[in-house]
Amino acid sequence: MAAIKKVVLAYSGGLDTSVILKWLGDNYHCEVVTFTADIGQGEEVEPAREKALKLGIKSENIFIEDLREEFIKDFVFPMFRANTIYEGEYLLGTSIARPLIAKRLVEIAKSVGADAIAHGATGKGNDQVRFELGAYALNPDIKVIAPWREWDLNSREKLLAYAESAGIAIEKKQNKSPYSMDANLLHISYEGQILEDPNVEPEEDMWRWSVSPLNAPDKPESISIEFQNGDGVAINGEKLSPANFWVNLNELGGKHGIGRLDLVENRYVGMKSRGCYETPGGTIYLKAHRAIESLCLDREEAHLKDSIMPKYAELIYNGYWFSPEREALQALIDKTQQKVSGVVRLKLYKGNVIVIGRESKNSLFNAAYSTFEEDSVYNQKDAAGFIKLNALRFIIAGKANRDK
C-alpha cells in the first residue's frame, strides 16, 4: 500500500476514537481530518471539536454535521417502507445508520483530498463490514484503516495507558453506563457486561429511553399518524419534519413502555451476539405502517413485499445498502408505496401498540363486497367454480394415489 498522506476519521470524541486519532499520526505519519455526525445520539457533538483541537487537529480539518433530517428522510423512512425486521425482531437501528456515515466519510475525503478513511469498529463486529462495504461501493479506490484490526491495544488497560502517554484527557463521567451503547434517532442499543450471558435478565436501570411497562400510565393514550406515499408526515394532525416526527414518536413510545427488545442475533461475521434495544418510535411506526398498507395495497402486492422483506433486511444488516440488489428491491418497494396514504389511529398502553382505526382515500376495502349482510354485487355461487379449479390438482393427485 502506498503511503497514506491524509485520512478522514469517524470521530466521536470518546476514548477509543481519540486514541485512534493519535495512533494514526504515530503510525501512519499522516494528516488527520475528523468527522463527527449528529444522527440523534442524544449527546452534544460540539465537545468533539474541542477535543480534536486539543489533540492537534487544525480547525479547518474538523467536520461536525447535523445529519438527523437526512438520516430519517433518506435511510429510516425508505427502510420502513418495506416493514423491515431482521430475524423476526430487530428493527435495524444500528445497521441503518452506518451507510450515511460511510457516505459522508467518502464525500469529505474527496473534498479535502484525503486518500483514506478510518473508523473505530472492532474486528469482531458487523460495523467494520458496513462501513467498509459502503465506502468501497462509493469509491473503489479509497483506502480504509481499521486500527482495531492492526494494533495491539486489545484491552481497556492498554488503551488507557496509551491515552495517558499521548496526553489524552480521560474523563470520568458520573452515572456512566457499564454497557457498550450506541444511539441514534431510531434506537439505543446495549451490549456487554452481564448481557454477555444470554440467560441473565438486564437490570431495570439499564433502560434509558422508556419506562417499564409496569410503571407506564394506567390510562391508554390515543394518537394518530398520517402517511403520504408510505412515509409518516404528521402525528395527531401536526405536520412535522422527518427528524421531529421521530423525536415525538420516541417520546410517546417511551412514556408508555413501548419498544424494549432483548434478543440473540446472528452477526454477519459468524458469531451470535446478545443485545438489548429500545426502539419506541419505530415499534409504533411499524404497526401503523402495516395498518395503512392493509387498506391501500393489493393482496399480491402486499404478499410480494412480505416475501422479499427478509432478504432486504439481511442486505441492510450485512452492510449492502449501496448494493445494486438493495437498490433494485428499493425500487420495487417504493413503487408499492405510491398510494399508501391515509391516517391510522392507535392506542398506546403499557408496552402495547393497538390499532383502533385506519382510513385512506386510496382504500381498497369495499364494504359492498365484504359485508356479512345481504349484498347485490357478489354472487356467492361463483365461489364454487373458483374452488373447484383450485382443487383440481388435489383431485387428480387423490385419484392417482387411490388407484395405486
Curated annotation (Swiss-Prot):
Whether Amino-acid biosynthesis counts among this entry's keywords is: yes
Look up and give the organism this protein is from: Helicobacter hepaticus (strain ATCC 51449 / 3B1)
Q: Which InterPro entries match?
A: Arginosuc_syn_C, Arginosuc_syn_N, Arginosuc_synth, Arginosuc_synth_CS, Arginosuc_synth_type_1_subfam, AS_cat/multimer_dom_body, Rossmann-like_a/b/a_fold
Q: Where does the chain bind ATP?
A: 10-18, 37, 120
Q: Which residues bind L-aspartate?
A: 122, 126-127
Reaction it catalyzes: L-citrulline + L-aspartate + ATP = 2-(N(omega)-L-arginino)succinate + AMP + diphosphate + H(+)
Q: Which GO terms describe its cellular component?
A: cytoplasm
Cite the binding residues for L-citrulline.
Answer: 90, 95, 126, 130, 180, 189, 265, 277
Which PROSITE patterns does the UniProt record give? ARGININOSUCCIN_SYN_1, ARGININOSUCCIN_SYN_2
Protein name per the record: Argininosuccinate synthase
- List localization entries: Cytoplasm
